[in-house]
Amino acid sequence: HTSNIEIQNPDLLHSRSKLDFGKGFYLTPLRIQAEKYGERFLRRGIKAMLNIFSLDDERENCTYKVFNSYDGEWLDFVMACRKGLPHVTFDIIEGGIADDQVFNTVDLYFSGIYTREQALNQLQYTKPNRQICITSQYVLDKYLHFQSSKQL
């Protein structure tokens, strides 16, 4: 997780809504992706901190959703979350991130310039980055463990 501060105890109160998978604490298993996100802070002259966590493999009483590709289900879910529409919620959601390249396609779809089919056709050739969104404070407290932080 990249932020402008060290975060040892994440809480959902500080999470923004209307993101790819809704309001939650976002992480990635891809260090290079987290460091690249930190560059956004640095370009604005803001300190960037890479916060490293471990997430228990065994998680009881959690709902978990994985999107393995940028498909119709992913597109519909992201659209509902980004527009703040009602949608099925999960404690943990994992799937592709709407980075700059993907966001352009998604934005064209949201604005009505692309049809759903055109957007999906564009997205099918894109290899998903990985993001994990934890939407449950219970899961954050019980299964996510702060390991260390590093200033980028």
Predicted region positions:
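Generic hydrophobic/packing signal
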Residues: 2-5, 27, 109
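Short aromatic-glycine-(Arg/Gly/Cys) micro-motifs in beta-strand/loop hairpins
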Residues: 1-18
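Conserved NAD+-utilizing ADP-ribose enzyme module
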Residues: 7, 19-20, 35-36, 40-152
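A short, exposed loop/beta-hairpin motif centered on an aromatic-Gly-Thr core
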Residues: 20-26
